[in-house]
Amino acid sequence: MKVSLADGRILRYWSSATTGPVVLVFHGCPDTRRVAMTGDAAAHEVGVRLLAFNRPGYGSSTPTDSTHTTVARDAAELLDLWGIERVAVLGMSVGGPYAAAFAAAYPHRTTALAVVSAPAMPREAPEGTIEDAMARMAPEFLAWRGRIDPDDEDDEALAARFLAELPEADAALLAPYGADLVGGLAWEALVETDGYLRDAALLMRPWDFDVADVRCPATVWVGEDDAKALAAAPWWTNRLPQAALEVAPGTTHLATLLTQWPAILRRLGTATG
């Protein structure tokens, strides 16, 4: 599904068929709205509605010179189009800063924040512009993208190649969702290059919002075996005014979300309800 924003750009989105408090999901990198589909069963169990969209440059969402704050504005416009006033927000991995940016910019609309497997903000920016950083990363990214070959119309083969690039524990949990979901995720994540490269470039420099401006209750979720996210967790808990930390035993990066969906949604749904 897609919507047209006021400036003419397209946002591709997905909504669960459930009813209840809305949880707005910000995907990781390389990732898409389809990661929210892995929480569909948990949404039914808990009684919440999931809403997720592809950031600019992913899938059919129009590329633009986006930042964390502009993506938060896109999310607010999407909610306006749906007539949704208040939401809980969930950010997976690189989506964590985007979810926090929304919570900081729209405190009156945000009931709770979940930051899952998210990185910390760097202290200093590298030399050059965001576009310079994107250009530097492009050759390595394009070589990796070429190995996955997102233009392959065989979902089974595409899903297999994408899963092979993930940590074994993450791939084992994602594979059962099927080639349609996984292959579609890989295609939307990689068919265009701007989304991934811009996400990576933005992650390498200080963000254009202050995490300390988040006013809602927040939970930082990390996996015990996700070393980078575990190391970043204190950065988040020390800056978010109302933060709790949850460490999922024996889980890696994506596995933290996939195994903790019910617990995450219960906490968000309670705050939203």
Walk through the language-model features, giving the residues of each.
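Conserved HGGG/HGGXW glycine-rich cap/lid loop of the alpha/beta-hydrolase fold
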Residues: R9-S60
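Alpha/beta-hydrolase
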Residues: T129-D210
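Conserved alpha/beta-hydrolase "acid-adjacent" motif
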Residues: D226-A232
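Conserved acidic catalytic loop of the alpha/beta-hydrolase fold
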Residues: T70-A88
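Catalytic active-site module of serine/aspartate enzymes centered on a nucleophile-bearing elbow/loop
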Residues: L240-G273
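Conserved hydrolase catalytic core segment
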Residues: E85-G128
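Short beta-strand/loop motif that positions the catalytic acidic residue
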Residues: V214, V220-V222
